[in-house]
């Protein structure tokens, strides 16, 4: 039966305020771990007299400087993100390495109880540190950050998501949380980290600390910052998996809502810089200068085999793997959705409960990771092992754990390890007989559920690596079941399993395929990987949405998809426009402007000319709240309602109208005017966008949505069908296209008639 519980249905956000009132003009969302107000970004260039004069005044040197700085910033993004990614991996591998070495040494000495205490207490301290600094210093750093970055690139802005404080806590918190053996990843936080680096570089410094760079003034707008953030997100993926092309495709397929060839070149340049820098740094680690776990983290999971081949008989198990990945992926998304909702009710009780939950998850995880290997039987070391067996303390396939000399614990090799090294063990070639069925199955179940319960804690945590390790475990299990009936070795099945689970949860095909190919250095798997990704995505799409879209909905982000809902074609623009509409005259009294700004939260106001400037009321343009505040602070008032002269424009600089960064924005309460000034007038004509986008009120809502999203605008003016009415009948914003708003205005619209086909199973209902 059809099911409308996915992205086609009305979002049921986590916020109680959003659940109670869906038609509120002010919007909030969960950013990281806290509820924050959100605003829309404006990618439209305001074509007013002041902008035209400023653009004409730019010299050829300034234009060259602008183009050159674009490429220089992309280079800087690549350098900084690669250094952060390397430091992140180095810190995690060594922190976790010290913990595992100390614990293993105690177990070798027979002090199992003390080993557990050291292991669990270390994990608890690291988790407590990560959750405390995140909850109290930078709540926006919680989670992976990918939903926030994806929403930003769609046009949704939130405070502090790209601030310096968020960047620092994201790095330190993720290092601490991953080192605590929580089943979380580094890739998602690296995407957010790259976006933070890009945004900070594009801000041109900080006025608060008197550190500003005038040569970056041209980038203080939403359009250029959007491009830089896209470069940063791609660089983050490239730094996580050493996959430069995969990073480009990830930004294209999953993150960016607007794309063009010029941006593609700059993103490719950034990821290429990341790859080169990481290669140089990794060469240093190969010489043993990076501490305990220098060969983990960013080193390739090399499963290349010259004699790897497959036949027609291998296609059927690969198809089965894709179907299983789609079903398990949709189940994973469903359960994660429910867990995040449950966590939110706990978080509503206060910060203390957030930290207590993180500590509880840490203790539970430590008990499982330490205790489960005792269920596995010891295996004799293979005589032809290519590495030391058993491996004591360090990474490897052969963990000694509680086993006698000459034996190893295969489950400990997977579960009592870092996530990166667990993936290396699962992907490793020529290891078809080193893991037992029971151990791989236990590891899969543990990863599947632990990653679900670990993601929602108040700490920087990603999903990419847990999904890979979970998929790799059941992929290897399928390969073990097939045994000699398949020409593919178990390591290749693990890679295909990881691909199928990524396709089932994240629904990315092209970028996932390239990332895994770059990660494993095995191009021979390309056809099989393409098939398994297509099947897993197709199967999973029959049940629910991809994981990041689900999380964005839960957080309350008003994300605009590239397609319009079918029921929108049955509604006109005029059906969703709500009032009252606030309009300014071209020459307006200052007192009126201040009153409107104080009594409304609107960020855009139509400017209308009437007699004596025009025979009948006519639309002149649109002016933004931020620009009005700049005019009020400058106090360019006139004693009578007359147009300003050219000298007025010369009093302003383009930087004064530039978009501020992550700092505190201007507010009307900060503007103090005398009674004399309130009775004066302000000419809005030179500063209004004289060519705003407009639609007639009889246009279908679906068509207006496509225009709104593709152009990337913040305000869409609605004009009347007939001429005997006011020149503007309303303004469409992002909020007006949200399903909960539309169906709140028109509850009689039958959604079931227009919903997409979904499969309903009793478990998913």
UniProtKB/Swiss-Prot annotation:
Domain CBS: 568-640, 687-748
GO CC, any one term: chloride channel complex
CDD domains xrefs: CBS_pair_voltage-gated_CLC_euk_bac
PROSITE patterns, per the entry: CBS (PS51371)
Protein location: Membrane
Entry keywords, A to Z: CBS domain, Chloride, Chloride channel, Ion channel, Ion transport, Membrane, Phosphoprotein, Repeat, Transmembrane, Transmembrane helix, Transport, Voltage-gated channel
Quaternary structure and partners: Homodimer. Interacts with PP2A5.
Family: Belongs to the chloride channel (TC 2.A.49) family.
Protein name, as recorded: Putative chloride channel-like protein CLC-g
Organism this protein belongs to: Arabidopsis thaliana
Lineage: Eukaryota, Viridiplantae, Streptophyta, Embryophyta, Tracheophyta
């Amino acid at each position: 039966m059809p099911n409308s519980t996915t992205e086609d249905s009305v979002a049921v956000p986590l916020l109680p305020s959003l659940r109670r009132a869906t038609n509120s003009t002010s919007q909030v969302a969960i950013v990281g771990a806290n509820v924050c107000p959100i605003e829309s970004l404006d990618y439209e260039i305001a074509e007013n007299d002041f902008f035209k004069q400023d653009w004409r005044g730019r010299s050829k040197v300034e234009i060259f400087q602008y183009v050159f700085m674009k490429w220089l910033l992309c280079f800087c993004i690549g350098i900084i993100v690669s250094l952060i990614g390397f430091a992140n991996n180095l810190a995690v591998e060594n922190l976790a390495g010290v913990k595992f070495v100390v614990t293993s040494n105690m177990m070798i000495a027979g002090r199992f109880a003390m080993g557990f205490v050291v292991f669990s207490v270390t994990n608890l301290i690291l988790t407590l540190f990560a959750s405390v600094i995140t909850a109290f210093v930078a709540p926006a750093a919680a989670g992976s950050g990918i939903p926030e970055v994806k929403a930003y690139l769609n046009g949704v802005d939130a405070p502090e998501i790209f601030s310096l404080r968020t960047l620092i806590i994201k790095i330190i918190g993720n290092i601490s949380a991953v080192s605590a053996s929580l089943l979380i990843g580094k890739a998602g936080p690296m995407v957010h980290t790259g976006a933070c680096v890009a945004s900070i570089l594009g801000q041109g410094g900080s006025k608060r600390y008197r550190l500003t760079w005038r040569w970056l003034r041209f980038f203080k707008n939403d359009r250029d910052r959007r491009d830089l953030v896209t470069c940063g997100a791609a660089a983050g993926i490239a730094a996580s998996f050493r996959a430069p092309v995969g990073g480009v495709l990830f930004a294209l397929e999953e993150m960016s809502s607007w794309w063009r060839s010029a941006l593609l070149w700059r993103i490719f340049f950034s990821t290429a810089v990341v790859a080169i820098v990481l290669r140089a740094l990794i060469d240093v680690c190969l010489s043993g200068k990076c501490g305990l776990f220098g060969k983990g983290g960013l080193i390739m999971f090399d499963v290349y085999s010259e004699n790897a081949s497959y036949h027609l008989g291998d296609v059927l198990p690969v198809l089965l793997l894709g179907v299983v990945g789609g079903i398990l992926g949709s189940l994973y998304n469903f359960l994660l959705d429910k867990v995040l909702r449950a966590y939110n009710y706990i978080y509503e009780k206060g910060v203390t409960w957030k930290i207590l939950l993180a500590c509880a998850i840490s203790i539970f995880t430590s008990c499982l990771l330490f205790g489960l290997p005792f269920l596995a039987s010891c295996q004799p070391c293979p005589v032809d092992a290519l590495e030391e067996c058993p491996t004591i303390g360090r990474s490897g396939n052969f963990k000694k754990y509680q086993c006698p000399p000459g034996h190893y614990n295969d489950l400990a090799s997977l579960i009592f390890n870092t996530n990166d090294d667990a993936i290396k063990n699962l992907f490793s070639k020529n290891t078809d007989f080193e893991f037992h069925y029971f151990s791989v199955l236990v590891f899969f179940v543990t990863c599947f559920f632990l990653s679900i319960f670990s993601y929602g804690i108040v700490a920087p945590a990603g999903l990419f690596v847990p999904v890979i390790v979970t998929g790799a475990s059941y992929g290897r299990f399928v390969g073990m079941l097939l045994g000699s009936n398949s020409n593919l070795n178990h390591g290749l099945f693990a890679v295909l399993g990881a691909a199928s689970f990524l396709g089932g949860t994240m629904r990315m095909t092209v970028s996932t395929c390239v990332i895994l190919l770059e990660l494993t250095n095995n191009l021979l798997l390309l056809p099989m990987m393409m098939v398994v990704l297509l099947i897993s995505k197709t199967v999973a799409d029959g049940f629910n949405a991809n994981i990041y879209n689900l999380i964005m909905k839960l957080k309350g982000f008003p994300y605009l998809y590239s397609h319009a809902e079918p029921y929108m074609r049955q509604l006109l623009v005029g059906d969703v426009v709500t009032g009252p509409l606030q309009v300014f005259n071209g020459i307006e009294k200052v007192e009126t402007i201040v009153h409107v700004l104080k009594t409304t939260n609107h960020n855009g106001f139509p400017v209308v000319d009437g007699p004596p400037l025009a025979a009948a009321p006519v639309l002149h343009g649109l002016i933004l709240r931020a620009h009005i505040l700049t005019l009020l602070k400058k106090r360019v008032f006139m004693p009578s309602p007359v147009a300003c002269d050219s000298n007025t424009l010369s009093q302003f600089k383009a930087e004064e109208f530039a978009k501020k960064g992550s700092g505190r924005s201007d507010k009307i309460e900060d503007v103090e005017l005398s009674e004399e000034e309130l009775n004066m007038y302000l000419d809005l004509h030179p500063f209004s966008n004289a060519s705003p986008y407009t639609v007639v009120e009889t246009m279908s809502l679906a068509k207006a949505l496509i225009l709104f999203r593709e152009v990337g605008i913040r305000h869409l003016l609605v004009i009347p069908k007939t001429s005997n009415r006011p020149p503007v009948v309303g303004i469409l914003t992002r909020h007006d296209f949200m399903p909960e708003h539309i169906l709140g205005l028109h509850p009689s619209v039958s959604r079931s008639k227009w919903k997409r086909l979904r499969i309903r199973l009793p478990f998913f209902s």
